Regions:
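Helix-to-beta-strand junctions that scaffold the AdoMet/dcAdoMet cofactor pocket
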Residues: 125-126, 139-140
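A structural alpha-helix within SAM-dependent methyltransferase catalytic domains
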Residues: 63-66, 132-136
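A short beta-strand submotif of the Rossmann-like class I SAM-dependent methyltransferase core
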Residues: 118-121
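S-adenosyl-L-methionine-dependent methyltransferase catalytic module, highlighting the catalytic core
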Residues: 129-130, 134, 144-302
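Surface-exposed loop/turn positions
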Residues: 49, 110-112, 142-143
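Conserved N-terminal segment of class I S-adenosyl-L-methionine
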Residues: 1-105, 115, 292-304
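A short, aliphatic-rich alpha-helical micro-motif
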Residues: 45-46, 110, 132
């Protein structure tokens, strides 16, 4: 993905508004998919490819991919979320398939797809190996699986940071996390603390080491592998903005605009968190140490033969 797109006004607005409503979240998903498309195009022909999206949720990403020419089948266990996706696809005038199903028991014949998308999904399934094994079965030879997930021991990998922005808080005993969330009365758009806990409770504690082992056992080779830090959304925008502003020739007005935006977006707490995560960032290049520093892993798995 192009980090420069983090500064795109439409993307920033979609990101900031993503919890306002179901429709806003679908639009955010579409914006994320548009960012991902150039990367995906490096590994398979996105024109008319047969693509399965596992864990599609409300379907926004699949809609954007279908608009780009992919033949998308969106699958999820959440029937209500799929219903939102069906309605959104109809409003967008997009032809795509929605199907309720389990990633560990895919209802497709062998070699049915050219690519599979597991975007922020594999950390929630009961058996990651079973899902990867099924993906291998339904892929054509040479097909790829695009995977993104936050390793469980990363600083903000608990899916609760919309409410609790404390590094590694999710590693505390589950009843403490639950009590803290349930004590909060505020909600963020459609997201409540109880719903955030429900998402947290699905996490399978997937690690980088555990994912690699499961992928190899399923038969895949690695076509792309990257472990990255996550420095908070304001922090990522600050870094990308500074790099852009300081490129030759550096422009003082661009630098000033970046700093003004950062001052508006950061609180004292989030800026201190940004400094802590920045200090940890080099650890993502060190095996084993990366487990406690990573914000996310982006992988492309390939089926050979």
């Amino acid at each position: 993905m192009n980090n420069q797109s983090l500064l795109d006004g439409d993307y920033v607005r979609a990101l900031d508004a993503r919890l306002d409503s179901d429709e806003a979240y679908i639009e955010y998903q579409r914006a994320e998919a548009r960012r991902a498309l150039p990367f995906l195009a490096r590994f398979f022909d996105v024109r008319n490819a047969r693509v399965l999206e596992v864990g599609a949720g409300r379907g926004g990403k699949g809609i954007a991919y279908a608009q780009a020419g992919l033949r998308i089948t969106s699958l999820d266990v959440d029937v209500d979320a799929l219903g939102m996706g069906v309605n959104a696809a109809r409003r967008a005038g997009v032809a795509m398939d929605f199907l309720a199903g389990d990633g560990a028991r895919l209802p497709f014949s062998a070699e049915a797809f050219d690519a599979i998308l597991l975007d922020s999904v594999i950390e929630h399934v009961a058996d990651p190996f079973a899902v990867l094994q099924e993906c291998y079965r339904v892929l054509t030879p040479g097909g790829v699986v695009f995977v993104v997930f936050p390793p469980f021991y990363g600083p903000l990998s608990g899916h609760i940071d919309d409410f609790i922005l404390i590094p590694w808080f999710h590693l505390l005993p589950r009843h403490i996390v639950q009590r803290k969330l349930f004590s909060m009365e505020r909600r963020l758009g459609f997201l409540t603390p109880h719903e955030a806990y429900a998402v947290f409770a699905t996490l399978n504690r997937l690690t980088i080491f555990g994912f690699k082992r499961a992928a190899r056992r399923a038969g895949f080779t690695f076509a792309y592998w990257r472990v990255r830090p996550f420095l908070t959304h304001p922090g990522m925008r600050l870094l990308v903005g500074l790099v852009s502003a300081l490129r030759r020739p550096p422009r003082l007005e661009n630098l000033r605009a970046v700093l003004v935006r950062a001052r508006r977006e950061f609180t004292v707490g989030t800026f201190l968190l940004f400094l802590l995560l920045s200090a940890l960032a080099p650890l993502v290049f060190i095996p084993f140490a990366q487990e406690i520093a990573a914000g996310g892993v982006k992988v492309v798995l390939k089926k050979i033969g």
